[in-house]
Amino acid sequence: CYTAQEIEGTPIYYSSPEYQLLDNENMPDAWEGCDGNRQAGAVYDMIMPDPQPVKPYGNWNKTRIVVYNQRVIHYMNDVKVLEFQFGTPVWRALVDHSKFSKFSTSPEKCPEAYDLMLQCGKQPGYIGMQDHGYGVCFRNIRIKEL
């Protein structure tokens, strides 16, 4: 069972970090941002995935997100591609230098998200999936409480 609702002026991506799922080859946004921080596996506009084991367009990619004790790990095709921790000076610096910062000069800036991003990991929340109008398929979605 699900429902989808977009409230004007408050997109879902204002509320939390985003594990970027997209086709690196054919989506222009994958090459925007800085140093690959908008490619598949990234924390959108904040942390680039390294390595980048994404499979080409038309193939299934396996993703996994582990969140435990404010530590977050992203996997792509069973390879760890990044790790970070909420509530640290490093996390704050990432937010401060992203389009979510109150101080951002980016034309895509979202300063409304700043305080929400700094509060991430302090309490349980929601898992959301969004699409920007392009085809996307999901299968075998599992959620396990740690």
Where are these regions (language model features)?
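Carbohydrate-interacting regions of secretory-pathway proteins
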Residues: 1-146
